[in-house]
């Protein structure tokens, strides 16, 4: 997560929902090699290390933000500019003064609050008129939204929704900043309990080579392990056939995909 503090930019880690790892292998999959090239799952990282926040600059940023919110003496006025961010706020029992317009359902507690426009292009006149203390947005839109936020008197944070680990780190951070540690810990524990049980069920089992193909109008892209869905596959025990890329998504030709010989698409 990245936020502005006293005119400087400070790096923080990213952010939510309970993930059903087995869905990666049970929904919308095509098994290409039912008796093929699968290998045994080997745990590579503990839950605690995955969710631990170790960056000292990041920790400092959280402490500064926490102190600033505490000094207000009142609940901060917060705007959430995407459905996912709004869901996070709901889980943390945070009140909002503004929320993005969306065709999807929003948490019941936010049904009557002011809508500020689409996630990709919020109406800054409405945003500014709500006099927010904080604006929370996904980091994928940072390059478009940050210049707009800098024109109004507010703090802002871009939440990294690119991985499950990042989501839960951000839940921890937001819980600390906005005095919602108990709610944040509830979400973390729910995830840990689920994932530890899932890992025990998968001990000694083989894991497939997976290709994550995402359809777009007129084309398609490949999701790598750096994308949110890619992190789900990794946590579920799958091996992404396009591991090693620094990008979230790739455009590749069909011949290259065929040569990867995935077990599951």
Could you tell me what each predicted segment is?
Residues 130-135, 238, 260-265:
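Alpha-to-beta junction loops
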Residues 3-17, 28-84, 182-212:
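Bacterial Sec-exported substrate-binding components of ABC uptake systems
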């Amino acid at each position: 997560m990245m936020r502005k503090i006293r005119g400087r930019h400070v790096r923080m880690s990213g952010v939510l929902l309970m993930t059903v790892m087995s869905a990666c292998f049970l929904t919308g999959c095509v098994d290409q090699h039912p008796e093929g090239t699968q290998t045994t799952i080997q745990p590579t990282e503990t839950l605690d290390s995955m969710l631990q926040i170790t960056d000292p600059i990041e920790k400092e940023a959280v402490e500064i933000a926490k102190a600033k919110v505490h000094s207000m003496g009142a609940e901060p006025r917060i705007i959430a500019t995407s459905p996912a961010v709004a869901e996070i706020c709901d889980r943390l029992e945070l009140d909002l003064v503004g929320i993005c317009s969306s065709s999807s359902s929003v948490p019941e507690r936010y049904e009557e609050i002011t809508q500020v426009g689409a996630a990709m292009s919020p109406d800054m006149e409405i945003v500014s008129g709500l006099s927010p203390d904080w604006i929370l947005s996904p980091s994928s839109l940072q390059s478009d939204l940050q210049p707009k936020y800098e024109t109004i008197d507010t703090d802002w944070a871009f939440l990294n929704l690119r991985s499950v680990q990042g989501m839960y780190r951000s839940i921890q951070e937001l819980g600390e900043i906005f005095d919602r540690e108990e709610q944040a810990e509830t979400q973390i524990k729910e995830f840990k309990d689920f994932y530890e049980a899932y890992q025990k069920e998968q001990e000694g089992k083989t894991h497939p080579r997976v290709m994550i193909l995402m359809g777009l109008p007129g084309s398609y892209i490949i999701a790598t392990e750096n994308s949110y869905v890619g992190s789900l596959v990794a946590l579920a025990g799958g091996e992404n056939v396009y591991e090693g890329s620094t990008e979230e998504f790739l455009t590749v030709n069909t011949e290259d995909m065929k040569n990867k010989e995935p077990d599951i698409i």
